[in-house]
Amino acid sequence: MTEAVSDVTLAKASPKPNSFWTLALGSIGVVYGDIGTSPLYALKESLTAASAGGALTQEMIFGVLSLMLWTLLIIVTLKYVLLIMRADNHGEGGTLTLMALLQSVMRRRFAAISLLGMAGAALFYGDAIITPAISVLSAVEGLKLVAPGFDPYILPLSMAILVGLFLVQSWGTAAVATWFGPLMLIWFGLMAVAGTANLMDNLHILGAVNPIYGIDFLLHHGHAGLLALGAVFLTVTGAEALYADMGHFGRRPIQVAWLVLVFPALALCYLGQGAMLLSHPERLENPFFLLFPDWALLPMVWIATGATIIASQAVISGAYSLTQQAIQLGLLPRMEIRRTSETEKGQIYIPRANWLLLIAVLYLVFAFKSSSALASAYGIAVTGTMVLTSIMAFFVMRKCWHWPAAVATAIIVPFLIIDLIFLMANLLKIVDGGWIPLMIGVGLMGVMVTWRRGSKIVARKTVRDEIDLNDFIASISVSSSISRVRGTAVFLTGNPNSTPTSLMHNLKHNKVLHEKNVILRVATEDVPRVSEDERLSYEPVNDSFAKITIRFGYMETPDVPKALVACRPLGFAFDMMSTSFFLSRRVIRQANPSEMPRWQGLLFVNMAKWSDDASLYFKIPTGRAVEVGMQITV
C-alpha cells in the first residue's frame, strides 16, 4: 500500500533577531578584520617596491596612494559592496555559495561552474594560510621600534601567539566574539585619529585622491610600477570576506559598516601615512606604527596584535565554514564537525582542518621570517579568487537576474580587466614566494576534482549492483524463509528507489528482517539552509517498509536522529533504543585497468581511508550503528 508523501515541520524556536547596529558592529569585528589590518604593511610594501631600493620621492608617494585609494573605491565599494553582494543564495555568500546558486539554474554547464567554484575555494585556502602569518608577524614586528634588542624574539613570539590561537579553537569563540566588534571599532577609530593628526600637518597629500597621479605613476615606472601595483593589492586582501560572511550579518549591516566607518578610517590612515612620509621619508621602515607618538608605541603594538588575532580568527572560521560547505557539496571527504555553540549557527570546529592549517601557517612563519618577505607570497590567491568571482557574477546577472547580455558585459568587463591587471602584477611575485599559494590552490583543486570524480564512480557502481526496491519488497512478501525480529532498521542509501546494499547483506548473512524497515536518504540541497517545513519527506510503502528523505543545506551539519524525531506525528514511532542504523562501509580499491589515472586513483583510495565514518558524520550513536562492509574498485 502506497500513500501520498507527507511533509513535516521540525519544531524550532526562532532566535530573537539582532538589531541593525548590533549586526553592523559584529561585522566590523569579523568581516573587516583582514582588510582592517592591511595598513600595518600595505603602504610600506608598495612604496618599497616603487622605490626599488632607491630614494623615495613625492611622485611615488602620490602615485601609490592614489592607486590604493582608487583600488579601495573600485574593488571593494563598487564591485563588492554595491554589486557582488546582491548575488546572494538565500542570504548567504561566498565562492561555493555562488557555485551552488549557478548550478541550480545552469544544469547544462554544471561541470564548468563546478570547476570555477572549486578553483575559487582552493585559492581561498591559500589566502587562509598566509593571512594569520603575515598579520601576526607585522604586528609583533612593531616591538622593534619599542626595543630594538627584541628582534631575536619576534619569530618565536609570533609562533607562540599562532599556536595559542589554534589551540583554543576547540573551545569555540562564542564567549569572546562579542568583544571582536568593540575592539575593532577602537582599532579603526585609532587609525582614523592618527591618520587625521598626521594629515593635518601636510594637507597637500589630499591631492593623491586625483586618479591621474596613479595612472601617471604606472606609465612612468615600468617594471617597478607593476611590482608596486602587486603590493597595492594588499589594501584589499580580505574584500572577499564581505561577500563570504554575508549570511552571518546580512547585506545592509556590512554595507553600512564599510561606508560609514571602515572605508573612511582606512583612507584617513593611508593618507596620514603618506603625509608623514612626505616630511619624513626615512620612516618608511614602519610607517604605520610611526604615525603614533613614542609613548603610544607599546600600547599600539599590543592593540595591533589583538586586531591581527581577530583578523586571523575570522579567516580560520571562514576556512571551517568553507570546509563544511565543500564536504556537504561532495567536494571533500567527510570530516568530524563539532558545534562549539548551541545558539550561534556558524560556530563550528573541524579538528583535521585546524591542525593542517596550523602546520601550514607555522611553516610559512618559519620559512619567511618577516612580514615583508611574506608579502611577496600574498595577493596571488586573492586576485585569482576575485577573477573567478567576476566570471561567475556575469552568469548570475544573465541566468538569475535575467539582465541583457550587453548590460552584464558592460558592468563586469571593466571589473574583470582590473582584476586581471592585478593578477598579472601579482604573478611577478611567483619566484619570490608567490608559488606557495598557487601550489596550495592547485593541490587542493586536484583533491576536490579527484574526490568528486571518484565518488561519482563509486555511486554509479553501487547503483548498478542494486535491485529495484519494489521488486525486492514483492519478492520477500511471498517468502516464508525470512524471520522477523522486533524493532526498527534504518538503511542509509543514496537512491531510495533501489534496495540498499546494507539491507541485502543483512538479509543474506543474518536471514532476518526487522518489523519496521526505513529506507533513508540524506540529501544536500543547493541552498545554505533548508526551511523546517521542507526538511522531511515521509512515504510509507507498506506495513513493513517506508521511505524517508531528510534534506539539509550545504551550510548545515546533518543530525539524522534529531531529524527522525519529526516523523512521530506521522505514525512512524521513532525510538532510538529500539532502532538500528545499517550503513555500508565501502573499502575502495584501485582497479586494473582503472577509470582514473593511477595517481588520481591512489589519491582517491587514500582519501576514502581518511574519510570519517558515516555514523559519526550523521550523529548516529555508535551503539546503534551496524556497518556492513563491501569492496568497490575504481
Swiss-Prot record:
Topology in the lipid bilayer: Multi-pass membrane protein
One Pfam short name: K_trans_C
InterPro entries: K+_transporter, K_trans_C, K_trans_N, Kup
Catalyzed reactions per annotation: K(+)(in) + H(+)(in) = K(+)(out) + H(+)(out)
Keywords: Cell inner membrane, Cell membrane, Ion transport, Membrane, Potassium, Potassium transport, Symport, Transmembrane, Transmembrane helix, Transport
Main location: membrane
Subcellular compartments: Cell inner membrane
CC terms in the record's Gene Ontology section: plasma membrane
Membrane-spanning residues: 20-40, 64-84, 110-130, 148-168, 174-194, 224-244, 258-278, 290-310, 348-368, 377-397, 405-425, 430-450
Keyword flag Ion transport: yes
A GO term, aspect molecular function: potassium ion transmembrane transporter activity
Role: Transport of potassium into the cell. Likely operates as a K(+):H(+) symporter.
Family assignment from sequence similarity: Belongs to the HAK/KUP transporter (TC 2.A.72) family.
PANTHER family: LOW AFFINITY POTASSIUM TRANSPORT SYSTEM PROTEIN KUP, OSMOTIC STRESS POTASSIUM TRANSPORTER
Protein name: Probable potassium transport system protein Kup 2
Organism for this UniProt entry: Rhodopseudomonas palustris (strain ATCC BAA-98 / CGA009)
Phylogenetic lineage: Bacteria, Pseudomonadati, Pseudomonadota, Alphaproteobacteria, Hyphomicrobiales
Underlying gene: kup2
